[in-house]
C-alpha cells in the first residue's frame, strides 16, 4: 500500500484536512481526563462513548488495510485507537468498582469478542474486494447506528425551544469534519467512506439551523425541566457522533447538569462538559 495517493491530489488534500480536524476532535476530551486525574474520580462521566469510539476506529483501521492509497485513513484511525485506549485506561484507573466492571465487560464483548469475530469471519470466509466490501458495509452500518445518537437532543431542542444543551461550536466542528471526509470519500470514489458522512453533514446542518432558529427564544424553566425528564437527559451522558474521525464517527459525551435558574437562551443555566466519543465512524465517518 502506497503511503500517499500521488495520483489523486484532491484525495490527499481532503484527507490531510480531515486528519487535522479529527486530531483536534480526538484531543478535545483531554481537559476532562486531566480533571479526572486531578480529582482521582470519574464523577458522572461514562466510558461508553470511548469504548464505542475505540471499536469504530478499529473497524475503520481494518477496512483501511484492505484498500490501496488510503494512508491518511490509516493515520487518523491509528491515532484514534491510541488515544481512546489511553482515555479508557485512565477511566478504569479512577472509576468506581461498578463502572470499572461495566467498562471491562464492554471491552471484552465489543472490542475483543466482536472485533475478533468480524476479523476471523472476514479473513477466512472472504477474499480480495469481497472482503473489503463486507468490512465497509459493517463500518457503514455501525456508523449509521452511532449517528442516531444526537436525535434525542435534537428532539429536546425542538420541544423546549432551547439550545442550552447543544453547543454551536461542537456542531459546527463536526459538520465541517463530515464535509471534509465526505469530499475525501468522493475523491477516492469510496462509497463506504462517503455515505456515513452524508448523514453526518445532514444532522450537523440540522443542529446548526435549530441553533439559529431557537437562539433568541425564551422558554419557561418548568417546560425545559419537563422535557429533560422525558428525554432522561439529567446527569447522563449523551453520545454524539464524532464525525471527524473515520471511526465514525466517534461519539462525544456531554454531561448535562440541571439548574434551577430561569431559562433564557442567552443565559447558560447548565454546565456542559464535553468529552469524547466521538463521536465520532470518526471520526469521522
From Swiss-Prot:
**Keyword Lyase set for record:** no
One Gene Ontology MF term: sugar transmembrane transporter activity
What is the protein's given name? Answer: Bidirectional sugar transporter SWEET12
Recount the UniProt induction comment for this entry.
Induced by the powdery mildew fungus G.cichoracearum and the pathogenic bacteria P.syringae pv. tomato.
What does this protein do, in the record's words?
Mediates both low-affinity uptake and efflux of sugar across the plasma membrane. Involved in phloem loading by mediating export from parenchyma cells feeding H(+)-coupled import into the sieve element/companion cell complex, thus contributing to the sucrose migration from sites of synthesis in the mesophyll to the phloem. Contributes to seed filling by triggering sucrose efflux involved in the transfer of sugars from seed coat to embryos.
Q: In which tissues is it expressed?
A: Expressed in leaves, especially in phloem. Expressed in developing seeds.
Q: Where in the cell is it found?
A: Cell membrane
Q: Which PANTHER family does this one have?
A: BIDIRECTIONAL SUGAR TRANSPORTER SWEET12, RAG1-ACTIVATING PROTEIN 1
Per the UniProt topology annotation, the Extracellular ranges are 1-9, 65-70, 127-133, 189-192
Q: Which residues lie on this side of the membrane: Cytoplasmic?
A: 31-43, 92-105, 155-167, 214-285
- The residue ranges of the MtN3/slv domain are 12-98, 134-218
Q: Keyword set for this entry? A: Cell membrane, Developmental protein, Membrane, Repeat, Sugar transport, Transmembrane, Transmembrane helix, Transport
Does the UniProt entry include the keyword Transcription?
no
Q: Which residues cross the membrane?
A: 10-30, 44-64, 71-91, 106-126, 134-154, 168-188, 193-213
Organism annotation: Arabidopsis thaliana
Q: After gene disruption, what is the outcome?
A: Under high-light conditions, plants lacking both SWEET11 and SWEET12 are defective in phloem loading and display slower growth, mild chlorosis, and high levels of starch and sugar accumulation in leaves. In plants lacking SWEET11, SWEET12 and SWEET15, severe seed defects, which include retarded embryo development, reduced seed weight, and reduced starch and lipid content, causing a wrinkled seed phenotype. Altered sucrose efflux involved in the transfer of sugars from seed coat to embryos thus leading to starch accumulation in the seed coat but not in the embryo.
> What's an example Gene Ontology biological process for this entry?
protein homooligomerization
Q: Which family does it belong to?
A: Belongs to the SWEET sugar transporter family.
The way it spans or sits in the membrane comes to: Multi-pass membrane protein
What GO cellular component entries does it have?
Answer: plasma membrane
Subunit-level organization: Forms homooligomers and heterooligomers with SWEET5, SWEET11 and SWEET17.
- InterPro entries of this UniProt entry? SWEET (IPR047664), SWEET_rpt (IPR004316)
Q: Pfam families given for it?
A: MtN3_slv
